[in-house]
């Protein structure tokens, strides 16, 4: 099987800052989708509470899809260097209370949108500091960049999601990028990805956004637990047996509930598997470490 060491980040500051692994399934010699067995070992110093895994399968696409929007790349924020932030910095934003506000935005060009391929993604916000008290809400809006606001440039506005006080991450409503049907041999138009926020009351709040991770939903599983995966224990997700369990001190136990499909490797494609981790305090530090080992079972079509 394949074994890789992963972190809770995907940037280019140093080798090994990866939250994914990839498999070239062309070399596996399988004619049918091959079930996958994953063993995720917690190599950190505290339990692992939430683990979200999303796969991106694509033929003839050698490059990894661009799934990270760094907070400091949004023009509306103030960049703050920080060694414990994704890409070495986060962005600080001022949110005026009492009305919805376009907090941060990123322009997605046609090359990025072609790679995103009209698929479904869940945006996961990672905050540098836990969210303050108050009924904070967040949502995403898509628009064409460069047009005057008077023309009503919002193309699609996704449902709002309420945040939890003290939490360091937030899963937003899934969205499709680009959201319209893809036309063969026609480049998609650039889009402005806008993060909007609302806080009741008057005055203002300061929000510190590290990054947004677009987790693929095509082949997706969410492992959730109130207990957590103990240090040095392994979470086994076995598509061979359709079974998920934890292995700790040579004993099998159940620590996590799973939501989603079991994983597979489609024939003749490149498959990327992306991981997002949350600790029991509801935070998502960038250097949470895991080791992932994967096996597949070859399947053949017999006539």
What name fits each language-model region?
Residues 1:
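Contiguous mid-protein beta-loop-alpha structural module that forms a pocket-lining wall or clamp
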Residues 5-303:
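Intrinsically disordered, low-complexity segments enriched in serine, threonine, and glycine
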């Amino acid at each position: 099987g394949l074994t890789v060491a992963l972190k809770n980040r995907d940037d280019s500051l140093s080798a090994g800052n990866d939250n994914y692994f990839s498999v070239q399934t062309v070399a596996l010699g399988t004619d049918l989708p091959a079930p996958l067995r994953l063993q995720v070992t917690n190599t950190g110093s505290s339990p692992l509470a939430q683990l979200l895994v999303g796969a991106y399968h694509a033929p003839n696409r050698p490059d990894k899809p661009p799934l990270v929007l760094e907070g400091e790349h949004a023009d509306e924020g103030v960049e703050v260097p920080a060694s414990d932030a994704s890409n070495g910095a986060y962005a600080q934003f001022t949110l005026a209370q009492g009305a919805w506000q376009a907090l941060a935005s990123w322009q997605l060009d046609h090359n990025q949108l072609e790679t995103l391929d009209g698929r479904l993604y869940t945006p996961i916000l990672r905050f540098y500091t836990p969210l303050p008290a108050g009924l904070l809400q967040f949502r995403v809006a898509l628009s064409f960049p460069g047009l005057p606001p008077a023309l009503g440039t919002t193309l699609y506005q996704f449902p709002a999601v309420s945040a939890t006080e003290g939490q360091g991450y937030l899963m937003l409503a899934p969205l499709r990028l680009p959201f319209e049907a893809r036309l063969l041999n026609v480049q998609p138009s650039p889009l402005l990805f806008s993060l909007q926020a609302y806080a009741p009351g008057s005055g203002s709040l300061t929000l510190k956004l590290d990054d947004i991770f677009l987790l693929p939903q095509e082949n997706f599983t969410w492992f959730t637990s109130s207990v957590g995966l103990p240090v040095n224990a392994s979470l086994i997700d076995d598509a061979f047996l359709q079974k998920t369990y934890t292995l700790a001190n040579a004993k099998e136990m159940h620590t996590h509930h799973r939501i989603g499909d079991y994983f597979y490797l489609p024939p003749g494609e490149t498959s990327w598997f992306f991981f997002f981790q949350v600790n029991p305090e509801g935070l998502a530090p960038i250097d949470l470490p895991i080791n992932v080992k994967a096996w597949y079972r070859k399947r053949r079509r017999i006539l």
